[in-house]
Amino acid sequence: MAENLYRARSRVYSPSVLFLHPDMGIGGAERLVLDAALALQEYGCDVKIWTAHYDPNHCFIETRELSVQCAGDWLPRSLGWGGRGAAICSYVRMVFLALYVLFLSGEEFDVVVCDQVSACIPVFKLARRRKRVLFYCHFPDLLLTQRNSALKKFYRAPIDWIEEYTTGMADRILVNSQYTASVFKETFKTLSHRNPDVLYPSLNIGSFDLAIPEKIDDLVPKGKQFLFLSINRYERKKNLPLALRSLVQLRNRLPSQEWDKVHLFMAGGYDDRIPENVEHYKELKKMVQESDLERHVTFLRSFSDRQKISLLHGCLCVLYTPSNEHFGIVPLEAMYMQCPVIAVNNGGPLESIVHKVTGFLCEPDPVHFSEAMEKFIHKPSLKATMGLAGKARVAEKFSADAFADQLYQYVTKLV
């Protein structure tokens, strides 16, 4: 990073950059926005973040190093009825936020970086002093929802059109993986002439290097030796039941004396304002009870960074269960902490994990996952060898320096 600071001082001019993000909570998208903002700030840019929701008690601690402003949190997140209408409410919140920033905030900036919701882009493009816009597409939003009824299809049609049209208004489009780039091209037919650039998320290595793992004795039940860890938000699309079903299959593969030493930590982002988080947590708890896994599973909701680092240090491996994941920052965190990863063999993990070197890429079924889990129990040296390979891969391919330099080049070319 010292080299970055030297380069920043040597520049005559660095642009002013404003980030626009729907909700600065705790998730992969928020981690990327935060890392991007910190990287540009270190390169000498004047950086500000504006968001529709920010809770200092439910966010990454590094947000305190940045100027984070909030507007529009009074607007509804959904139309009620179990979270229905969340998409249109998100669009309204982001358009309001863009209008507020442009006309009421007094902010001066050269480039806008926005992500997740593209509906705000026209506000900046149609302003009297048009702003240059960089849009980071984590994944086409229209693919993240079900259309199980004619009413839902009718509701989504204009939203999907707005997403595609406004995404095309960005001056530059970035995606998080080659996989997402291919899906982008297949999904947005009218944008076939646009070729998004791939900017892999980076890992904030400094925070991991400085952290001292704590003892996890208070978290680990007595007698447990073979510890596994699942890290993901409490959302159904993350396929968390796969981890529990894999645990059931593992029980069938092990003698009772070994099974008694097995424990799984189900950890991840949880927000009681989000109905799906609350509902899915209850579903998983019920599944644990019905599968007779109470003595083998511990749920951790919105656990701290220190707890995460300590668990990654103490567990045999991470179970990463989402299918067709856009990229996934969790495998990078695990590999850098020398904790191998068992992941589904599609989507982003194909670009981050090397099969049988830094972890295992498996079919998304409990049998294959449990087979990989058993390997770590019966061959303890696997964690050490795969862990070293994983850390080396993250340092080589997903370094913060490479991410920062590439992002800075994209931003400065817009000015």
Curated annotation (Swiss-Prot):
Its main location: endoplasmic reticulum. InterPro entries: ALG2 (IPR027054), Glyco_trans_1 (IPR001296), Glyco_trans_4-like_N (IPR028098). It catalyses: a beta-D-Man-(1->4)-beta-D-GlcNAc-(1->4)-alpha-D-GlcNAc-diphospho-di-trans,poly-cis-dolichol + GDP-alpha-D-mannose = an alpha-D-Man-(1->3)-beta-D-Man-(1->4)-beta-D-GlcNAc-(1->4)-alpha-D-GlcNAc-diphospho-di-trans,poly-cis-dolichol + GDP + H(+); an alpha-D-Man-(1->3)-beta-D-Man-(1->4)-beta-D-GlcNAc-(1->4)-alpha-D-GlcNAc-diphospho-di-trans,poly-cis-dolichol + GDP-alpha-D-mannose = an alpha-D-Man-(1->3)-[alpha-D-Man-(1->6)]-beta-D-Man-(1->4)-beta-D-GlcNAc-(1->4)-alpha-D-GlcNAc-diphospho-di-trans,poly-cis-dolichol + GDP + H(+); a beta-D-Man-(1->4)-beta-D-GlcNAc-(1->4)-alpha-D-GlcNAc-diphospho-di-trans,poly-cis-dolichol + GDP-alpha-D-mannose = an alpha-D-Man-(1->6)-beta-D-Man-(1->4)-beta-D-GlcNAc-(1->4)-alpha-D-GlcNAc-diphospho-di-trans,poly-cis-dolichol + GDP + H(+); an alpha-D-Man-(1->6)-beta-D-Man-(1->4)-beta-D-GlcNAc-(1->4)-alpha-D-GlcNAc-diphospho-di-trans,poly-cis-dolichol + GDP-alpha-D-mannose = an alpha-D-Man-(1->3)-[alpha-D-Man-(1->6)]-beta-D-Man-(1->4)-beta-D-GlcNAc-(1->4)-alpha-D-GlcNAc-diphospho-di-trans,poly-cis-dolichol + GDP + H(+). Mannosyltransferase that operates in the biosynthetic pathway of dolichol-linked oligosaccharides, the glycan precursors employed in protein asparagine (N)-glycosylation. The assembly of dolichol-linked oligosaccharides begins on the cytosolic side of the endoplasmic reticulum membrane and finishes in its lumen. The sequential addition of sugars to dolichol pyrophosphate produces dolichol-linked oligosaccharides containing fourteen sugars, including two GlcNAcs, nine mannoses and three glucoses. Pathway: Protein modification; protein glycosylation. This is Alpha-1,3/1,6-mannosyltransferase ALG2. GO terms for cellular component: cytoplasmic side of endoplasmic reticulum membrane. Transmembrane segments: none annotated. GO terms for molecular function: GDP-Man:Man1GlcNAc2-PP-Dol alpha-1,3-mannosyltransferase activity; GDP-Man:Man2GlcNAc2-PP-dolichol alpha-1,6-mannosyltransferase activity. Residues 1-84, 106-415 are cytoplasmic. Its EC number is 2.4.1.132, 2.4.1.257. It is a single-pass membrane protein. It holds the Pfam family Glyco_transf_4. GO terms for biological process: dolichol-linked oligosaccharide biosynthetic process; protein N-linked glycosylation. Belongs to the glycosyltransferase group 1 family. Glycosyltransferase 4 subfamily. Residues 85-105 dip into the membrane without crossing it. It is found in: Endoplasmic reticulum membrane. Keywords: Endoplasmic reticulum, Glycosyltransferase, Membrane, Transferase, Transmembrane, Transmembrane helix.
